[in-house]
């Protein structure tokens, strides 16, 4: 199936979002307008099957390119602003989230697979983490679909609320607002969209916190693979689950690190950094339009009360813990 129809629709929404941001809604940002427009149009008008391949490609690939190009706009001196306290914040936040989500999943009666997918999606990077963990635990398609739907719903709520909560709690401190958004939001797109509602510096810092979480994906995949093997061995005897090597470290993280290293060592001329920022911004806006188009609100209504409790309790836990850790470690 051709990706062209879905891509062109996402691109058109990105163009409209850019114009709306430039001439009418100056404070929202093109990325935020794009995902909101996508949600509205996708749920009301654009449900054709011919669009699915293109919006799926735009959501995944363009967002990855956006993150990679961002590496040419920062240096390790920028990452150094996060410091050991920033790394400590991310590690404690991720480990605590995984423990809490697994605990709540068991208490609410969800399967071990759903709990693992929810834990990885909320702790690391949303749908991408769920897709990476799914094959190593042998999850069913229905379990993956349920987890992705809930993680995206909670991510959307956080995406729209964290900019205001961060400003209310931390004032104009971009580092702390970036830590809150980058340390709790589920997907890269939601991090960027949320931080864009604040300012460009917060977007950069939030993305750096998010990149640190993405780098931890390899360890999360290994952990859940080992955990699943142990559980199945206890239940069924010796078994073997293959872990896909290409699920470990996303290529766009490597690209980000390579470009960041080059910028640190040779210092890109302003034109190169400006071009990378331009490409990153447009890839991001088109991708977020696609994310909005693919967000099916009906799925969330069908999710059920118990799943909603699961998602909301995870959301509250993540935000409260992040606020406490940021105040203790970073502030």
Swiss-Prot record:
Keywords: Cell membrane, Membrane, Transmembrane, Transmembrane helix
Disulphide-bonded residues: none
Domain of life: Bacteria
InterPro entries reported for this sequence: UPF0324_pro (IPR018383)
Transmembrane segments: 2-20, 24-46, 82-104, 114-136, 148-170, 204-226, 247-269, 308-330
Topology relative to the membrane: Multi-pass membrane protein
Principal location class: membrane
Compartments where found: Cell membrane
Entry GO CC: plasma membrane
A Pfam family that the UniProt record links to this protein: Cons_hypoth698
Entry similarity comment: Belongs to the UPF0324 family.
Name by which UniProt lists this protein: UPF0324 membrane protein YdhF
Name of the encoding gene: ydhF
């Amino acid at each position: 199936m051709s990706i062209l129809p879905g891509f062109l629709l996402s691109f058109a929404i990105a163009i409209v979002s850019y114009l709306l941001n430039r001439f009418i809604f100056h404070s929202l940002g093109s990325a935020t307008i794009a995902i909101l427009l996508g949600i509205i149009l996708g749920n009301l008008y654009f449900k054709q099957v011919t669009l699915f391949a293109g919006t799926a490609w735009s959501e995944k690939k363009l967002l990855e390119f956006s993150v990679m190009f961002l590496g040419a706009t920062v240096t390790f001196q920028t990452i150094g602003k996060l410091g050991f306290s920033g790394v400590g914040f991310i590690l404690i936040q991720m480990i605590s989230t995984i423990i809490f989500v697994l605990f709540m999943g068991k208490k609410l009666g969800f399967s071990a697979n759903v709990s693992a997918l929810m834990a990885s999606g909320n702790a690391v990077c949303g749908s991408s983490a769920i897709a990476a963990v799914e094959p190593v635990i042998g999850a069913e398609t229905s379990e993956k679909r349920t987890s992705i739907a809930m993680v995206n719903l909670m991510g959307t709520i956080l995406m729209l609320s964290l900019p205001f909560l961060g400003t209310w709690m931390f004032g104009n401190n971009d580092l702390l607002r970036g830590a809150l958004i980058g340390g709790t939001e589920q997907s890269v797109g939601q991090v960027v969209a949320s931080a864009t509602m604040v300012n460009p510096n917060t977007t950069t810092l939030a993305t750096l916190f998010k990149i640190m979480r993405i780098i931890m994906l390899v360890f999360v995949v290994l952990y859940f693979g080992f955990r699943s093997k142990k559980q199945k061995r206890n239940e069924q005897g010796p078994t073997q689950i293959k872990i896909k090597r290409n699920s470990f470290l996303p290529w766009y993280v490597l690209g980000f690190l390579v470009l960041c290293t080059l910028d640190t060592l040779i210092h890109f001329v302003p034109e190169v950094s400006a071009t990378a920022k331009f490409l990153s911004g447009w890839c991001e806006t088109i991708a977020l339009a696609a994310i909005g188009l693919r967000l099916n609100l009906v799925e969330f209504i069908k999710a059920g009360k118990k799943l909603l409790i699961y998602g909301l309790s995870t959301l509250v836990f993540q935000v409260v813990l992040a606020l406490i850790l940021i105040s203790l470690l970073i502030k």
